[in-house]
Amino acid sequence: MKRKRSLVLDDEDERAVELFADLGMPKNLAKTLIYISQCEECRSADVEQGADLRQPEVSVAMQELRKRGWAKKRDLKKKGKGRPVHVYQLTKPLPEILETFESEKLNEVKNIKNNLDQLQGLISDYRK
């Protein structure tokens, strides 16, 4: 990851994002995951800048990461009035998240293979 004012995704990070996307993960989710995996904690605004995403895209991605149990959020109170700042961090290391993702994808492949086998059996009756 390159450092400007905040961290930004580099070519290697972008390649990881593309691979996750090729495997069916939404690109914004992949960008967010890769970005926060390289930070101890990061604010929503950091993810927006570093991963080149808009606030709603980060919000949706973070909801999914939290739903999967891969990330957690805490609110950082600012002095004075105003909304708190959301700070995020992963709850599991990226290699463990990849293992879970791989398992999900292998299950999908298994189900596809099973459906194709069943379809093959049904279609073989039509040829007669």
Each predicted region: which residue ranges?
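Amphipathic alpha-helical dimerization/coiled-coil segments
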Residues: 92-128
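N-terminal start-of-chain detector that recognizes signal peptides
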Residues: 4-8, 20, 43-44, 58-63, ...
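Canonical helix-turn-helix DNA-binding module
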Residues: 45-85
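Short, cationic-aromatic polyanion-contact patches
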Residues: 18-28, 43, 76-98
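N-terminal leader segment of winged-helix/HTH proteins
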Residues: 1-23, 79
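N-terminal helix-turn-helix DNA-binding core of bacterial DNA-binding proteins
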Residues: 19-53
